UniProtKB/Swiss-Prot annotation:
Source organism of this protein record: Salmonella typhimurium (strain LT2 / SGSC1412 / ATCC 700720)
Family per similarity comment: Belongs to the SpaK family.
Gene: spaK
Keywords: Chaperone, Virulence
Name under which the protein is recorded: Surface presentation of antigens protein SpaK
Subunit-structure text: Homodimer.
Domain of life: Bacteria
General function of this protein: Involved in a secretory pathway responsible for the surface presentation of determinants needed for the entry of Salmonella species into mammalian cells. Chaperone specialized in the storage of effectors within the bacterial cytoplasm, maintaining them in a secretion-competent state, and allowing their immediate delivery to target cells upon contact of the bacterium with the host cells. Has been shown to chaperone SopA, SopE, SopE2 and SipA.
InterPro entries in the cross-refs: Invas_SpaK (IPR003065)
Length: 135
């Protein structure tokens, strides 16, 4: 895989999505990039071993709620995810919190427009999962 400038890719994706460039601060490509959202958990973007992950921690109480909403959540995951490698989102536990993750398919890393598709898609899933877990 050729060198990926994740900071520039994220900046471009945010601009393509309509974010005012003056609202985008300095982005450090050497650490996890965190996009703070209103009324939703932050979206994190990180690179590990040349793979790009988009993820969000859904909250400490989410593990308990997961037991109550497992069927609904599983059905959402089984719908598939076009921008994720393997076509599936992942749920895991990280630091005691339920975490929604997507390993971004390389086809969505070539430019800001394609990455914005992945980023916006993840945002939409985050809304669905947050709504399910916060009911």
């Amino acid at each position: 895989m050729q060198h990926l400038d994740i900071a520039e890719l994220v900046r471009s994706a945010l601009e393509v999505s309509g974010c005012d460039p003056s609202l985008i601060g300095g982005i450090d490509s050497h650490s996890t990039i965190v996009l703070d959202l209103f009324a939703l958990p932050s979206i994190c973007i990180s690179v590990k071993d040349d793979d790009v992950w988009i993820w969000a921690q859904l909250g400490a109480d989410s593990m308990v709620v997961l037991q109550q909403r497992a069927y609904e959540i599983l059905m959402t995951i089984m719908e598939g995810c076009h921008f994720a490698r393997g076509g599936q989102l992942l749920l895991g536990e990280q630091n005691g919190e339920l975490t929604l993750k997507a390993l971004v398919h390389p086809d969505f890393l070539s430019d800001g427009e394609k990455f914005s598709t992945a980023l916006n898609g993840f945002y939409n899933y985050l809304e669905v999962f947050s709504r399910s877990l916060m009911r």
